[in-house]
Amino acid sequence: PKEILEIPKLGCINVHGSLLPKYRGAAPMQWSIIDGEKVTGITTMYMAKGLDSGDMLLKAEVEITDEDTFATIHDKMAVTGANLLLDTLDQLEAGTLERIPQDHDAATYAPMITKETGHIDWSKNRQDIINLIRGLNPVPAAYTIYEEEVLKIFGAVISDVQADDAANGEIVAVVKKGFVVKCGDGCLLITEVQARGGKRMMTDAYLRGHAMKEGILLQ
């Protein structure tokens, strides 16, 4: 409530995991990776009645590399966010901060992650699927259905296997390092998985104990 936010003399400050007004909401770090962003960041801001809509104070950018996952970005952002909050408090106390209103017309949203968010749609292109896997690694994890069982997927790389006649989601090859799945624009090699009730492991280790079949359609 507005009356609560107005109690502190210097206002209520929030640390948000995006460069506002982009990615307002519950899961900005995950969605920035899922959407293929190359840069994200931290914004300190005044809390307001609307969702992440308050005036901004300071920002700091954080690079998203091709290898970053939700776990690694979370850790980078935690350090950046802590330092930015200290800078914000110091400048707030000194009276040197400017309030910067958000451009509400430019706002985008990062809704809460649900289990269904992680259900892989194999008709999408390979990079979009890789980004989904990265953005939900380690939790809740992207997943597919193999022979009526959930199979979580934590790693995938673009494969040069050609399978133009295969259906999207079809296992087109089982090789030493993993299994190859047909996607909307080519194939992916799945490199790290976790079966229901099992441990997370590299796919080559998983295949030593599980015989995956070519031609099976992942759902």
Please describe what each predicted stretch is.
Residues S123-Q219:
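An anion-binding loop in the catalytic cleft
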